[in-house]
Each structure stands twice: as C-alpha cells, then as structure tokens.
UniProtKB/Swiss-Prot annotation:
It comes from Cronobacter sakazakii (strain ATCC BAA-894) (Enterobacter sakazakii). It comes from the Bacteria. GO terms for molecular function: intramolecular oxidoreductase activity, interconverting keto- and enol-groups. Signal peptide: none annotated. Its EC number is 5.3.2.-. This is Tautomerase PptA. The keyword NADP does not apply. InterPro entries: 4-OT-like_dom (IPR004370), Tautomerase/MIF_sf (IPR014347), Tautomerase_PptA (IPR017284). GO terms for cellular component: cytoplasm. Homodimer. Belongs to the 4-oxalocrotonate tautomerase family. PptA subfamily.
Amino acid sequence: MPHIDVKFFPRDLSDAQQQALADELTQVIVKHLQSKESSVSVALKEVQPEQWKSEVWDTEIAPQLDTLARKPGYEM
C-alpha cells in the first residue's frame, strides 16, 4: 500500500495537471514496486516558501537526512 506525499511550492496547477502528476507518480510506483494502481495513494500539498523550513525541512527532511533516498541540494 504505497503512499506518496509530495510537498512543493505553489505552482498554480490545474486539477488536470494535478491528476496527471498523480497518475505519473503512480505509474513509477507500479513499475518499481510491482504494486497495483488501486493500492497507491498520492497526496499533493502546496507549501508556501516562508513555511517550508518549519513545515517540511525541520519536521521531515532534517530528521531523516541520513536515510533519505535522495538528499536535497540545499541546506536550511
């Protein structure tokens, strides 16, 4: 039951663009984890730039920096 939680700066994506992103992310999971499409859930959340550090960096990125599969190319 893979769950993908994507946080990003506001991009003004239409509903169709958000759905396309979720669909493509789902296909990557299906391909690499051999999951069923119906087992994958995707959350897309826009985070304001001024809130990124407190909402994402401090709570999700920094605490697990050593175990991230891909580390960001920036520090805060």
